Structures are given as structure tokens and as C-alpha cells.
């Protein structure tokens, strides 16, 4: 085999192996991210939202915290009894970015709160964001 042909084949193989390794690392990183989110969702987000929900329910508000079985997202809905509108806040994975996207929808507006790395999703963060959301919801009633 000619040397230039041999080198071309070896270069193509090396390029493939490099891309394949990068893809495998990307898949491992995504698995780590999804696993990390599953743990944070169960041990941080849901308990933090439930703590807020207890306080709101005691004050007469309807508050539902839901986590999908197949969908890894979380949704919290807060509304006053008999209200037609059911404002909600969601936590959804942005797998391409390895972040969690938080959206909020109230009677007046719907917009992303932002995208956050897993290490930003703490109990304090979750409760602060849902409190801001509730403040908006409460101010729009009446």
C-alpha cells in the first residue's frame, strides 16, 4: 500500500475515534446531569416546594406540586379558591445545555425565569423563586 493511502486511512480512523470518544463523553455527561437532576428533584426541589405549599394551604390558597413519572420536570400551581386562572411554575431539563429551565406563567404574563446549573438549585433558591412567583400571583388577584 502506498504511504499516502495508508496515512489517509489512519487519519480517517483517528478522526473517527476522536469524534466517537467525544460523543461517548457527551453521553456520559448527559447521564451524569440527568442522574444529578433526579437526585436534586427528589431531595431538594420537591421538599422545598412542599414546605412552601404547606404554608400557602394553611392560608387558604390552593397549591399543587407535581412531578412527572415519565417527564423529569416539576410543576407547582398556585391559585386562590374558585379562581379560573391556575398560575404555574415549571422546572424543565434543558438537556442540550445541561441546565434546568424555570418558567413562570401568571394571569398577566408567561416568561422564563432563567436557565440554571444544577449546583444553583438549592432549597433556598427554590423557595426564593417560588416566593417571587407567589408574590406576582397574589398581586394580580383582585
Please place each PLM-identified region on the residue numbering.
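Intrinsically disordered, low-complexity regulatory regions enriched in serine/threonine/proline
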Residues: 1-25, 108-142
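Generic hydrophobic, helix-prone segments enriched in Leu/Val/Ile
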Residues: 6-13, 65, 88-93
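Intrinsically disordered, low-complexity regulatory segments enriched in Ser/Thr/Pro
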Residues: 3, 77-128
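Contiguous, amphipathic alpha-helical segments that mediate oligomerization or scaffolding
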Residues: 15-59
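Ser/Thr-rich, low-complexity intrinsically disordered terminal regions
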Residues: 61-84
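Amphipathic alpha-helical interaction segments
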Residues: 24, 45, 69, 99, ...
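Generic hydrophobic secondary-structure signal
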Residues: 45, 49-52, 56, 76-78, ...
Amino acid at each position: 500500500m502506498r504511504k499516502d493511502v495508508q496515512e489517509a486511512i489512519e487519519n480517517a480512523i483517528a478522526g473517527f475515534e476522536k469524534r466517537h470518544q467525544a460523543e461517548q463523553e457527551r453521553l456520559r455527561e448527559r447521564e451524569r446531569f440527568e442522574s444529578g437532576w433526579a437526585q436534586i428533584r427528589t431531595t431538594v426541589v420537591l421538599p422545598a416546594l412542599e414546605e412552601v405549599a404547606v404554608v400557602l394551604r394553611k392560608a387558604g390558597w390552593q397549591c399543587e406540586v407535581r412531578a412527572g413519572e415519565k417527564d423529569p420536570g416539576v410543576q407547582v400551581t398556585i391559585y386562590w379558591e374558585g379562581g379560573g386562572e391556575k398560575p404555574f411554575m415549571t422546572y424543565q431539563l434543558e438537556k442540550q445545555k445541561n441546565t434546568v429551565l424555570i418558567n413562570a406563567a401568571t394571569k398577566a404574563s408567561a416568561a422564563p425565569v432563567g436557565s440554571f446549573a444544577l449546583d444553583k438549585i438549592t432549597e433556598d433558591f427554590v423557595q426564593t423563586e417560588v416566593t417571587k412567583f407567589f408574590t406576582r400571583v397574589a398581586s394580580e388577584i383582585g
